Amino acid sequence: MPTPKRQLGDRGEQVAAVYLERCGYTIIARNWRCRNGEIDMVARDGDYLVFVEVRTRRDEYALESLLMHKRQRLVTLAYHYLAEHDVPETTPWRIDVIALTVVGNRLVVTDHVMAAIGEEGCA
């Protein structure tokens, strides 16, 4: 049985997926894994391939919980995904972060930061 923290994270990813679809994104993959870790979601936003990190917290510090080592690992994971899926080098991509916070009994998207992790991946 998943821990309460894992259950909250799973709920957050479900809410984030619905949010992205309502914003016009197409979800390509969820919980994509390789030996280096996991990407919560891979989506399309127009011409962009978007790697999405979902941060779900019970307090208002969801975005602040994304530490530097995790940011660096997300960039590494994005490169692994691009290579494994033979994505053309000309394909523009970015890493977005979606923050959700528990408000009462609901999960609320509090932030959606596009290209949140530097310019490393933008073609």
Curated annotation (Swiss-Prot):
TM spans (from-to): none
Short name of one Pfam family: UPF0102
Recorded superkingdom: Bacteria
Gene3D superfamilies cross-referenced by the UniProt entry: 3.40.1350.10
GO molecular function, one term: nucleic acid binding
HAMAP family recorded: UPF0102
Family classification: Belongs to the UPF0102 family.
Protein name: UPF0102 protein Cagg_0930
